[in-house]
Amino acid sequence: MASLCSNSSTTSLKTPFTSLGSTPKPCQLFLHGKRNKAFKVSCKVTNTNGNQDETNSVDRRNVLLGLGGLYGVANAIPLAASAAPTPPPDLSSCSIARIDENQVVSYSCCAPKPDDMEKVPYYKFPSMTKLRVRQPAHEADEEYIAKYNCAVTKMKDLDKTQPDNPIGFKQQANIHCAYCNGGYSIDGKVLQVHNSWLFFPFHRWYLYFYERILGSLIDDPTFGLPFWNWDHPKGMRFPPMFDVPGTALYDERRGDQIHNGNGIDLGYFGDQVETTQLQLMTNNLTLMYRQLVTNSPCPLMSLVDLTLFGSTVEDAGTVENIPHSPVHIWVGTRRGSVLPVGKISNGEDMGNFYSAGLDPLFYCHHSNVDRMWNEWKATGGKRTDIQNKDWLNSEFFFYDENGNPFKVRVRDCLDTKKMGYDYHATATPWRNFKPKTKASAGKVNTGSIPPESQVFPLAKLDKAISFSINRPASSRTQQEKNAQEEVLTFNAIKYDNRDYIRFDVFLNVDNNVNANELDKAEFAGSYTSLPHVHRVGDPKHTATATLRLAITELLEDIGLEDEDTIAVTLVPKKGDISIGGVEIKLAIVKLVCVVNLLTLQLNKDRFCYDSVFVCWFVCLFFNFHV
């Protein structure tokens, strides 16, 4: 390894940093309760204080599930959040990043600022003769591992010799810190790339440049990042190449659970599951199936949440929710433990957004997260990228391998092959891992448990709780199921955004369910959240979210299609949680036109939400195309 790295010196690198200052239409989902329910239109909304509010707290759950995705906007979509694409951050306004409201990051996460941001060009892909191929980390040979260590070593050397060089290791790690912990604000609103539709494209661009930087440092334009293949049984352990002390890929700020060949728990939230390694692997495959198949039938119920910039609701798409977040927590140190330097852990490195990029494993983990975007689309059906212009035209700012600044757009990162890389073909056993075993022999007696009206609002989910809930329709035909997805929705989920959060949802079981065995047909899904900064200046640290679970397939598998009432059980796993309410709706799943209504200036000062929603409504039912 040493000889491989000794061929050139990082101190002789010449980059422009020295001149720096400090496809198919998507499916739209419309919610319906009883089919005879009237549709009312009004541009005025009365809030709980009796005041008229034209821009805030506009609850459109009964109109447009497409504005929420599977984990979506429950309410309070600020006007500024829906009027335009997210612009690249203004580096001149970059501020101190925060671990939470009471702790600031002890160093600046701000990127070096170009002399003139207005002159920063848009990135154009360089010509290529060969695709970079990302391979599974557990299959990497010694030659590749040596090359990878060499590249990261050279990147870390820049931290010492040229600390302001944007291609240095710490500068690259700071990108995640600034974008994810309150470093950037636009018009007074924190720019947060997590819990929003920016999650996948931001991280794809981030890894794209990181990978090219590594390749340039070792003069290998074909170098590809490895991906941690945690979705396959052979990859469900910590990649050995990252656990060798003294190497560039090692990080001492990791949890003890990663060692000794322990299998990863893709639903991990701070506590080890008391079960066998075989059951853990089975749970992992079940979670993968639920997240990428059952609960993600189309783009706005899947990978891409449509939580817009500036929204006060914090929600994630299915893959960001699980397995992305649990993997972060499983690798990081336990919160409250003592770090090697004597400080109290906030989950560093991987378990907190501000420090995650300091662990080389972060990029290997997110390489597989990025791969999931491709695998999800390859599953077929209505799983295609959305074509909303506000998403496609959202922008980020990065430096390339030569230290040159560029702006990039979401629309240019939808095809990895056009970006110059691809993934080594790997089996995906989770794709056909549909749980078939039932936890219950028959239907739970819904008359023996309280109805949802007697349970919600739920002040604290501190123990397993069961309730019954009425369905909007039963005994539906296959044609009706194809047209409308049945969605179980939990509204106004509230929790402290400084904590790890998780609860699981089961159908047709009572509160004695074994929640450590997820490979059951009754397991519907989970809600999770990582500690993060979403709104600076919130002393209560209260996050509000919505969880939506697609249950049509589950009801078929359990044999409850003809039932008017079903039983639901919630099992808390981590954190203090309250839930405002629950309901079951029917969501129309149909390929329709996408009119870029948010760009129509109905009023130059503000938009009338209801006029916009009426247009979407007409677009669906009159099959209007542009």
Swiss-Prot record:
Enzyme Commission no: 1.10.3.1
Class of enzymatic activity (EC top level): oxidoreductase
Transit peptide, residue positions per record: 1-83
GO cellular component: chloroplast thylakoid lumen
Ligand binding (Cu cation B): H324, H328, H366
Compartmental location: Plastid, Chloroplast thylakoid lumen
Residue pairs linked by disulfide bridges in the UniProt entry: C94-C110, C109-C177
Catalytic activity: 2 catechol + O2 = 2 1,2-benzoquinone + 2 H2O
InterPro entries given in the database record: Di-copper_centre_dom_sf (IPR008922), Polyphenol_oxidase (IPR016213), Polyphenol_oxidase_C (IPR022740), Polyphenol_oxidase_cen (IPR022739), Tyrosinase/Hemocyanin (IPR050316), Tyrosinase_Cu-bd (IPR002227)
Required cofactor names: Cu(2+)
Function: Catalyzes the oxidation of mono- and o-diphenols to o-diquinones.
Name of this protein: Polyphenol oxidase C, chloroplastic
Species of the source: Solanum lycopersicum
